[in-house]
Amino acid sequence: MKKTTLLNQALSEVVAGMGHGDLLVIGDYGLPCPKGVRRIDLALRPGIPAFLDVVETILAELQVEAAVVARETAERNPAVQEGLTRLLGGVPVTTVSHEELKEISARAVALVRTGECTPYANVILRAGVTF
């Protein structure tokens, strides 16, 4: 059995297979998954698992060099914005419109659907390198 933080098999496979520059989307329950992008659905019920819990878990496993967040998040969901700022630390964050975030999502290797049912709880993580 795995001993590290990330236990979900499908998500572990995706993270382990990501290369430098690959994109991973973590989204709320309502974020659409573009055609051709692998969906990893973690949602059990509204709020479970929470978006920030999933982000924190993935950040423990994935080297991230940059992130993309919708600019609407700061205004419409300040708690998520504050949580992302805390979790991402010094990772550079680009803000785009929610529509642009959905367009960029089409280039992701996977989209992780959480049980989060608050607006604009979405982030795109760009994989970095550990050396």
UniProtKB/Swiss-Prot annotation:
Keywords (A to Z) from UniProt: Carbohydrate metabolism, Cytoplasm, Isomerase
GO biological process, alphabetically ordered: D-ribose catabolic process
Catalyzed reaction equations: beta-D-ribopyranose = beta-D-ribofuranose
Superkingdom assignment: Bacteria
Q: Pfam families, per this entry?
A: RbsD_FucU (PF05025)
Regions crossing the membrane? none
Q: Name one GO cellular component term.
A: cytosol
Entries under NCBIfam families matching the protein:
PRK11797.1
Q: Provide the family line.
A: Belongs to the RbsD / FucU family. RbsD subfamily.
- Official protein name in the record: D-ribose pyranase
Protein's organism: Symbiobacterium thermophilum (strain DSM 24528 / JCM 14929 / IAM 14863 / T)
